[in-house]
Amino acid sequence: MDGHPDQDAAGDAASAACRAMGCAVLQAPVWVWHWATPGDARVPWSQMVALKTSPAAVELKKQALACHRSQLSPVVQGQAPILNAAIRARALRPVEYFFVQDAAA
């Protein structure tokens, strides 16, 4: 769903395993925010839920982002880093979004 073939393949395999075990599937949209717009038919917007996170969880996300030094600096001089300011700000919001499919889907 996120547009990266390796990540989509891993997600598909994990989703199949969850469904085989009768578990609900939650998918976190990481890159969909970059290529989709509201109403984009490729995205199951009706399956999206928002879950609040605690201040402690936000702090842990901040610490985790800091560990990705290679993505916090420009790969090429003069270009923005992969994890630019907008991506970091979105990651530190006190809410996480997921697409939820029940076990029968």
Annotate each predicted stretch with a short phrase:
Residues M1-A105:
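Metal-dependent de-N-acetylase/amidase catalytic core
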